[in-house]
C-alpha cells in the first residue's frame, strides 16, 4: 500500500449528504475482484448521461476537477452496503483523501485498508473547505498527516483528529499484510519455539 504523508492536490466539492456506496460504485461494476479499472465506474450513474457520454454538469467531469485527488463531501459519506469496491473505485480514479463531517463505519475502515485517508471535520470547517474547493483549478488543499493539518489556498489551516494506530499504518503504507510482515520475526520465533514443544502440531 502506498504511504500517505502529505498530499497536495485539487479538491472537488460534493456537498451531498448520505452519498452511499451504490452511488460511489453501481452494482454493474461489482463483478470483478480486481482493484484496478474501477475508476471508470466511479459515480457512474451521475457521471454519465443515458447515452454513455460524460455529464458536463457532474463535478468530476468539469475540467478544473478532472484530476482531483481530494473530495470534500457531505455528511455520512459511504453509507449503505459494505462493498470494498467503493474505496477501490475512488483510489483507481485518483482520490487519496475524502473530507466530510462523518463516514459510515465500514467504509471509513475500508479506506484506511486501501490507502485513502478519510478526514472528519466540523460542519463549520466543512463549509469553509467546500468554499475553498469551489474555486475550480485554484481549489488546492494540502493534507499533512504527520501534522494532522489541512491547509487551504488562503494559507489558513484546520487541524483534525485521527486514531494513532490508523495514522501509523497510513504513514508507513501498512495494510493487513504489511502489518503481519512487521511482526514476521516474532511470528517465526514463536513457530520455532512452538514446534520444539509441540512437534505433533
Swiss-Prot record:
It is an enzyme of class 4 (lyase). It comes from the Bacteria. SUPFAM superfamilies: LeuD/IlvD-like. Pathway: Amino-acid biosynthesis; L-leucine biosynthesis; L-leucine from 3-methyl-2-oxobutanoate: step 2/4. It catalyses: (2R,3S)-3-isopropylmalate = (2S)-2-isopropylmalate. Keywords: Amino-acid biosynthesis, Branched-chain amino acid biosynthesis, Leucine biosynthesis, Lyase. Disulfide bonds: none annotated. Its EC number is 4.2.1.33. One of its GO terms (biological process) is L-leucine biosynthetic process. Catalyzes the isomerization between 2-isopropylmalate and 3-isopropylmalate, via the formation of 2-isopropylmaleate. PANTHER family: 3-ISOPROPYLMALATE DEHYDRATASE SMALL SUBUNIT, 3-ISOPROPYLMALATE DEHYDRATASE SMALL SUBUNIT 2-RELATED-RELATED. This is 3-isopropylmalate dehydratase small subunit. It comes from Agrobacterium fabrum (strain C58 / ATCC 33970).
Amino acid at each position: 500500500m502506498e504511504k500517505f504523508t502529505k498530499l497536495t492536490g485539487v479538491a472537488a466539492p460534493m456537498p451531498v449528504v448520505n452519498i452511499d456506496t451504490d452511488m460511489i460504485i453501481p452494482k454493474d461494476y461489482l463483478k470483478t475482484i480486481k482493484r484496478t479499472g474501477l475508476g471508470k465506474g466511479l459515480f457512474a450513474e451521475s457521471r454519465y448521461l443515458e447515452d454513455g457520454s460524460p455529464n458536463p454538469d457532474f463535478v468530476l467531469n468539469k475540467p478544473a476537477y478532472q484530476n482531483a485527488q481530494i473530495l470534500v463531501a457531505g455528511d455520512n459519506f459511504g453509507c449503505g452496503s459494505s462493498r470494498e469496491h467503493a474505496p477501490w473505485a475512488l483510489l483507481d480514479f485518483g482520490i487519496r483523501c475524502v473530507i466530510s463531517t462523518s463516514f459510515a463505519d465500514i467504509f471509513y475502515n475500508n479506506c484506511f485498508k486501501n490507502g485513502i485517508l478519510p478526514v472528519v471535520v466540523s460542519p463549520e470547517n466543512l463549509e469553509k473547505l467546500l468554499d475553498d474547493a469551489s474555486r475550480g483549478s485554484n481549489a488546492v488543499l494540502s493534507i499533512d498527516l504527520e501534522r494532522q493539518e489541512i491547509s487551504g489556498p488562503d494559507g489558513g489551516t484546520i487541524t483534525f483528529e485521527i486514531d494513532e494506530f490508523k495514522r501509523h499504518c497510513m504513514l508507513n503504507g501498512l495494510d493487513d499484510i504489511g502489518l503481519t510482515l512487521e511482526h514476521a520475526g516474532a511470528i517465526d520465533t514463536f513457530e520455532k519455539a512452538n514446534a520444539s514443544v509441540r512437534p505433533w502440531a
